[in-house]
Amino acid sequence: MRIIGIETSCDETGIAIYDDEKGLLAHKLYSQVKLHADYGGVVPELASRDHVKKTIPLIKEALKEANLTSQDIDGVAYTAGPGLVGALLVGATIGRSIAYAWGVPAVPVHHMEGHLLAPMLEDNPPPFPFVAVLVSGGHSMMVEVKGIGEYKILGESIDDAAGEAFDKTAKLMGLDYPGGPLLSKLAEKGTPGRFKFPRPMTNVPGLDMSFSGLKTFTANTIAANGDDEQTRADIAYAFEEAVCATLAIKCKRALEQTGMKRIVIAGGVSANRRLRAELEKLAKKIGGEVYYPRTEFCTDNGAMIAYAGMQRLKNGEVADMSVEARPRWPIDQLTPIA
């Protein structure tokens, strides 16, 4: 079975073709970073218009890369949510339309389920069950995963997601868009221990998280200490340390609560090297294991959508003729796959 995956939930247009026997046959990704850079963030209308321009050409490129034609495709998977409604509608409309034109089934895919299953694209995929640390620009949550579609949210951010906190703090520090990766790069030059940032909500029971206060703490630290280059690097170090330590503390509690020892890190922030190091240290301490996708599959991409869609199509899930876009869609509402 060969599935083409379409990802347009935010500011990346991702197209991929996945074969259940041969694996990934093609992977195309276009980022809109330059388009939104002048605005300091994603402009939804511009994102939607750019997806309209890029999706069909990328589909053609993916077919060419895989040396396939539309007649070789057995199904279409498209991101139906959560995300920006206009951007989602572009991918959903194109996905549903080409499925109809090609005479194959289509299936809507949950964006975060795609991220959660992205490590399955690797040579050493994680076996079920595990605790997933899903961290991106729009979501931060701890999820108990017993199988595909068997998700229980153990805790989530009550305000800013981790990736959002990185980007907002970077903007506060005068870094260009997208700021999260630039903040992490600046943190590499930081002095450990000069500043100590709080670990939000780690002094209370439960697994919910809060990261918005760290932005205020950063602003106050800059005001009190100046913003010369080394001070900025030291502040970036302390901020990143606080976010990663908080996630590690919450993950440890999630493992204790579930009795599990396997950790999956997924979503855009899963590319962060310090976060990976913190969770690897935790896993080593408890005799567990950590799994994460290669860097190119941490960001939004079509490969994870093609893979997740294949699992859904094999389970008999097929969309009707309507075009489905769900900007809000709790991951624990998905149907388990037997």
UniProtKB/Swiss-Prot annotation:
<dbReference type="GO" id="GO:0005737">
    <property type="term" value="C:cytoplasm"/>
</dbReference>
<dbReference type="InterPro" id="IPR043129">
    <property type="entry name" value="ATPase_NBD"/>
</dbReference>
<dbReference type="GO" id="GO:0005506">
    <property type="term" value="F:iron ion binding"/>
</dbReference>
<dbReference type="GO" id="GO:0002949">
    <property type="term" value="P:tRNA threonylcarbamoyladenosine modification"/>
</dbReference>
<feature type="binding site">
    <location>
        <position position="111"/>
    </location>
    <ligand>
        <name>Fe cation</name>
    </ligand>
</feature>
<dbReference type="Pfam" id="PF00814">
    <property type="entry name" value="TsaD"/>
</dbReference>
<dbReference type="InterPro" id="IPR000905">
    <property type="entry name" value="Gcp-like_dom"/>
</dbReference>
<feature type="binding site">
    <location>
        <begin position="134"/>
        <end position="138"/>
    </location>
    <ligand>
        <name>substrate</name>
    </ligand>
</feature>
<feature type="binding site">
    <location>
        <position position="272"/>
    </location>
    <ligand>
        <name>substrate</name>
    </ligand>
</feature>
<dbReference type="GO" id="GO:0061711">
    <property type="term" value="F:N(6)-L-threonylcarbamoyladenine synthase activity"/>
</dbReference>
<keyword id="KW-0479">Metal-binding</keyword>
<protein>
    <recommendedName>
        <fullName>tRNA N6-adenosine threonylcarbamoyltransferase</fullName>
        <ecNumber>2.3.1.234</ecNumber>
    </recommendedName>
</protein>
<dbReference type="InterPro" id="IPR022450">
    <property type="entry name" value="TsaD"/>
</dbReference>
<keyword id="KW-0012">Acyltransferase</keyword>
<keyword id="KW-0808">Transferase</keyword>
<feature type="binding site">
    <location>
        <position position="180"/>
    </location>
    <ligand>
        <name>substrate</name>
    </ligand>
</feature>
<keyword id="KW-0819">tRNA processing</keyword>
<feature type="binding site">
    <location>
        <position position="300"/>
    </location>
    <ligand>
        <name>Fe cation</name>
    </ligand>
</feature>
<feature type="binding site">
    <location>
        <position position="167"/>
    </location>
    <ligand>
        <name>substrate</name>
    </ligand>
</feature>
<keyword id="KW-0963">Cytoplasm</keyword>
<comment type="function">
    <text>Required for the formation of a threonylcarbamoyl group on adenosine at position 37 (t(6)A37) in tRNAs that read codons beginning with adenine. Is involved in the transfer of the threonylcarbamoyl moiety of threonylcarbamoyl-AMP (TC-AMP) to the N6 group of A37, together with TsaE and TsaB. TsaD likely plays a direct catalytic role in this reaction.</text>
</comment>
<feature type="binding site">
    <location>
        <position position="115"/>
    </location>
    <ligand>
        <name>Fe cation</name>
    </ligand>
</feature>
<keyword id="KW-0408">Iron</keyword>
<comment type="similarity">
    <text>Belongs to the KAE1 / TsaD family.</text>
</comment>
<dbReference type="InterPro" id="IPR017860">
    <property type="entry name" value="Peptidase_M22_CS"/>
</dbReference>
<dbReference type="InterPro" id="IPR017861">
    <property type="entry name" value="KAE1/TsaD"/>
</dbReference>
